[in-house]
Amino acid sequence: MSVTSWFLVSSSGTRHRLPREMIFVGREDCELMLRSRSVDKQHAVINYDSDKDEHRVKDLGSLNGTFINDVRIPDQKYITLKLNDNIRFGYDINTYVLEQIQHQVPEEALKYCDPPVIAFEQIPASSDKHEKYTSHLQMCSKTSAVREDQFKEQGAHMDSSQAKQEKVDKKSATDVPAYRTPLYGQPSWWGEDDDNKLGKEGRSQDEHYSERPKDMTQHEEEVSDNMGYRDSPDQCMYPFRREPSYFEIPTKDFQQPVKPPETQVYEIPTKDTDTVPPVTPPVMQSHASFTIEFDDCKPGKIKIKDHVTKPSMRQRKTAGKEPGPTEMVSAESKVADWLVHNDPSLIRRPSPGEDVYSTKSDLPIHNRTLKGNKHEDGTQSDSEDPLVTKPEQETGTADHPQHQRQFNREPEELLHSQQAFVIEFFDDDAPRKKRSQSFTHNSNSPPNDTDPILKAKVDKRKGTVHVEKVSTNGTGSTAPASKSLSSPSFPQRSNSFRREKTEDRIASTPITARLPGKNYGSVGKKSKLAQEFAAEYMHEQAEVVKQAAEKPMTLPLSASILQQPASQVQISSQVQAMPVTSDVRSETIKNEEEDNLSDAGTYTIETETQDREVEQARKMIDQVFGVFEPDEYSKISSTVYRPVINKGKEEHLGSEPSMTHKPIMSLSTPPIKLSNGLQAEPLIERPGSSSKSGQKWVSRWASLADSYPDASPTSPSDSQKQGFIADDEDVIERIEVQGEADPTVPSRTRRLLPQLPPENVMPTIFVCQESFSAESQRKHVEEPEKGISAENSSLLLVQEELDPDSLSDTSRSDDGVLSVRKSAKASKIYRNGWKGEEPHSRESSVQRTLVSSSEKKSTCFYVGNDDMGSLKQTTSGLSSKDVVKNHESHINLKANVHSNVETPSAERLVNQFHKKENGSAKDPLSFVRQESFTKEKSSSNVSPNKLPHISTHPLLKDLSVTKSSHDYSQETRLILKETETALAALEAKLFTQSHLDELENTPSLRDDSLSGESDVDTASTVSLVSDKNAPIHSQQNRIVNLQKEKSSSTSSIQEQYCQSSARERLSEKRRTVPADAGTRSITKRVGMTRSTGARGSLDFTDEERSSSLPYMPVSETVSSDYENSSSRHISRRKPIGQTCKEDSSRSSNAQKVQQALTRSNSLSTPRPTRASKLRRARLGESSDNECADGERSNISPGTSSANSSSAKSSTEPKKPSRLDILAMPRKRAGSFNVPSDSETYSSVKAMFSGRSVDQTYTSRKPAVAESKQPPKKPVAPTQKQTPSKARSSSVKYSSSSTTQTSRSSSVSRHHKSSRQDEDEVEQEVYNNFMAQSVEIAEIARLSQTLVKDVASLAREIHDVAGDGDSQSSSGTGQSTSISSVPNTPASTISAREETIKRPLQRTRPLQLVHHIPEASLNYQKIPPGSTGLEDFDQNMNDSREDPSKRRARNIEEVIFDNLMLNPVSQLSHTICSDTEVLTEKMKVLFQNTEKNWEEIEAKINSENEVPILKTSNKEISSILKELRRVQKQLEVINAIIDRSGNPEDTASNKKTSSTLLTSNALPRTTNNSAARTQSQTPGHLRNYIHKSSSSSSRSPGSSFSRDDEETYIV
């Protein structure tokens, strides 16, 4: 056949073959090296377009450019080279003409030769200094592979190998012009004549070196190793290998030769097999001339001193030859690396055993997948294997499965493996062959499909010949083939790694395949363990084989296959063969281990020479650890892999690819694929036994690795393995799932868990505890939802176990049991029902993990099986109900054992539970929201409903399962609601107590644990959305979820502070409920407590809880949490239930508790924000209480008028400094729990008046807002409030975090929902109006005073306003979460006025809101917890919130207030504007003293922080803000004007003025937002002022506060 080769002929006549792949041209490390100084190190790239069969050159941005026909080509752009084009690189004196030559290559040569080797020989035309080319660069890797094969086939096949090599040489010679440089050792590589000569000499050399195939093979192996060497796995990633700078021609040239892939494939085996020696000597010589020293690479003496040496050593071990110096390996490994880089397909080509470099790649997974199924990439290794097997059957039948598997791996490797040198794909039976092929195969990557087959054929032929030499039957031949494959060093690297993965597949599939795979997989790093485990595994396998005597025919075949790779001597009996192989493997492993310690790494060097035992041990180790698989595994989620294991180890092992890629689906098929050509049953049986022993071993090993005894799962697995042998497929699948593959995946999963903690770990842990029965129950409950990810569910079922390493360990041992249990229950469950049952458990696991199809989830899933496994194991024979019961007990135990770990998870479980009860529709929202905690990406496959399961703790899962099985949904729901209420109360209390601190610590994002995604949104927005959009029932569920989330965030704090009390309280309540409900409650309690971390719900004492919880029935608690929260937000009238509560607990503490509970209930609905949680965690209950008290007193002045019904706590701010700190915009914005502080305050006030309910709805966080708002209005019984109110309040709650617009809508709803509330509100409004009138009078006074003090008030406005007011506004602004709402009186005022105006919001809320926003600048520090504060602050911050936040005041009151306030407001605006102008002028005048100005301003701002009296009237607040701003500005100006420029004097003046203001009862905003607003340019201030005056709202403050708030939120 004619082969076309392209050459670059230099002006000196040197001919450079252009490989059909990318090569680099440059001075260093390039395939075509030019010595001209005008040529860059990497000057240009010549790439081959296989579609168009043309070469293209691209200048790599070189300094001197690349010229085609004396025209410089643009940089970084491919230019097509045409025939006879004149190419010059830089100003090199040599120009190159593109020539095309066609060579006649015998068909035989093409068959037996890999793509022609590319040899670049450049003879410097002008001067050596300009061009110093390595004389020759020939990659005879394919020929070498052929030679290796021949060498392996020495003896009976020596002649045939020689002939093949000769053919290869011919081919190489012929191909030289056609693109292939002659194989190494060929005499003439450059021209057609050289190629022809090469064909002759190659043949003669082949004949010559047929005698010394070792040298040739070693040399080629080294070359191949260099090419496919794992040293530069990264390089392998690259399209080209720069490392092989030694080679002028990239190894991939071989891969791209015109010759058919067959030739390439054969060359690959040649490389791996030492049978190719005939070509090797010339190659050696060629290498002598090349930088790569191939002279030492003679068959018996691999002299390649490159990295290949190590792989070659492996080859030698396989072939019984010792590789030459490692030095040779390096050169060739460079070649191999270069080839791999140049040929991505080569990179993928590395056989599974060759995945040394892909330890973290997907190769292992793919290898497993390749075993018996299609690859995820879509390749079908089995189908490929059959093709290879057919040609190879000529050599030996035993080789067929091996080669088939090899090819399976090969496509997988080619597709997935980025390793350059694993061209040959070793079958699970003969991974070594694959490795040897892998090198050349990488070269021949373009014809991946054909090449693998050809290579497999060649390998099998060689292997068969070699086996015959060894005088063994087909099995023996398989072993030699494997050895030959393993000969190549570089492939071995990838193969060893890939082997591990492949071995995992193989372990399930025929033992023969498994053993080689194992050796490769485990050889390197795990060689010793691999040996030990291999021996054990072999023995176990032998026993299994005996047990599987019923399938002796197939088993003997696999056994023989295994035996042959293990030792050349064939062992007839499988049992004997297996032990022998293990011994041999151990020896081989030892040898390879020595070699394995090469730079490539232990795994890298290990190859086909290792004994079966070693391979098996490695495979088992890999399975147990999932070390190799995880990397590749990462692509193919461990979940996918895992489910396969669960479904059937056989599937996983036998059809590794399908297992990996479609673990669930391939459940029924694995047995057949396992056989790869063997009978399905025998293979299944065999894999089953193998799997059983392997599983056992794996489980044992996993338990050791994870510090958990896997004995129980192991023995169950074994017993089930043995016991289920009769049920071959199902049993084996189960066994595989349970014992070997399962532990393997779990191990990997565990390893992955640390990697995936954010997404998978938490979900996994939660899933983990759900028992199999729980899974089944969940399945029944959630099966419809889980239908989406049935397969994934299967995977996740096991994966769930993997969440924490500890759980994963336990789960692993239990996992095997679980799988066994499941199989005992129904083997069909795994196959048919697995998708049904497991999808449910997976609903939790997959949904939680969102793993669905992703295989990573298997890691999590494994954890789920952990606990489930143990339960299932014990109840393997039990019905699902029994299992459920057992699981319940197990859960109960777990609750005790894992309570700490499970706490957050338990909460989620409860949430999930409620969600489930409420319906799957709700589940998605809640789950998704919980997912924010888990940060589980809503996996494509996982529905939002599933997400909560992911986040749900295993115990919670169990509880959920128990609930469904025991119908605890009602009781549990009540308990959960009760718990939530208690937690909400605790949170509210803590919130209020630590609200200020939390505001200060706004940055605290502990809510991350709850929802990494949602800082403020998830708690408030989600709950509001759900409440607003969903029915109350769903709202309640969402509330539960929110509460759970909150509690989960605060749970850590609760645990720290009151965990025991919270849990005890929950437990006590739950005790009344059935045990299952109790269990769930416990888990929830734990979870909530834990999740409540910073929330502060723990702040509530048991007494408080008891006092508050009893007041609200459990059912009432949940619904009332939402409803109360909403109603509190919505209206100020007392709900009857709330009134009753207040009445029953009139004591300040009792009331506080109740209000806290009520608010906390609403609060718990939106889980605590990170900020609030963090603050609570820092400050604790006392801090929150203190804040609440201080805030209360601070707020009360404003609240006294604002909260007319409330006692109007002391008007003077108790802790302005603390409030200021809390009001800091960053902290405030960051912690949306700030409202909780103000809410706490209002709850405290609510003691006096039970009106805390409505305030909550105004605050960003309803609970928080309520806490502050209740003071304004007597707390109406939460029960009294209508669900619509609750919803609207929830809506308001969300809007408070989002916007006041939501509030307005919620206000409207509230208004509609209850006119009684409106009436009450009207009364309150009237009271507030009166209070506002008083405040207005005070403001007028203040205005006058301020006008007098304008001169003394100074520019400190900027700093002070920005720091304090804008902070509080930022805290309040758009994220009116509890933390965001300032604790300052202004917030209270706004909330109060807002609450009053809410019913009327439709009419005038906008104006009021606008006023409030301006005022809110001053009151941003006010805790957002109070509804009034929220409205005030938010209105100041967000005019959109204003409509909803504006109190539903009587129109008359509003008008009256406006009339009263407008003049004052205008006056204050005028003063403020004038002051602003004056300040600016003063700044200009004192520009030189700008520094002093800033300092003085800062000092004054810090010293002049006087909280403005909290006023329900937002306009009043804005006026006060403006006046205070003016005051500060004047103070700054005075300080500046003062020649001394003494800020202290100014500060004293300021203090005096503030004292006057205080004496005048001027509410001063502790917030610096007003000052900050003032700090803005006067123009802005004026604009805002005018706007606010027109709208009777202080937009400037609001806008500034909004900005600040947004900034801080970010």
Curated annotation (Swiss-Prot):
Residues 148-237, 304-523, 648-730, 737-756, 774-853, 931-951, 1001-1240, 1253-1321, 1361-1404, 1419-1445, 1540-1610 are annotated as: Disordered. GO terms for cellular component: cytoplasm; microtubule. Residues 23-73 form the FHA domain. Keywords: Cytoplasm, Cytoskeleton, Microtubule. Pfam families: CEP170_C, FHA. Disulfide bonds: none annotated. The keyword NADP does not apply. InterPro entries: Cent_Immune-Sig_Mod, CEP170_C, FHA_dom, SMAD_FHA_dom_sf. Residues 164-173, 196-221, 452-469, 497-506, 776-788, 834-845, 1062-1073 have a biased composition (Basic and acidic residues). Residues 437-448, 470-495, 712-722, 1017-1040, 1048-1061, 1116-1128, 1146-1167, 1381-1390, 1562-1578 have a biased composition (Polar residues). PROSITE patterns: FHA_DOMAIN. Residues 1193-1210, 1287-1307, 1363-1380, 1549-1561, 1588-1600 have a biased composition (Low complexity). It is found in: Cytoplasm, Cytoskeleton. It comes from the Eukaryota. Belongs to the CEP170 family. Plays a role in microtubule organization. This is Centrosomal protein of 170 kDa protein B. It comes from Xenopus laevis (African clawed frog).
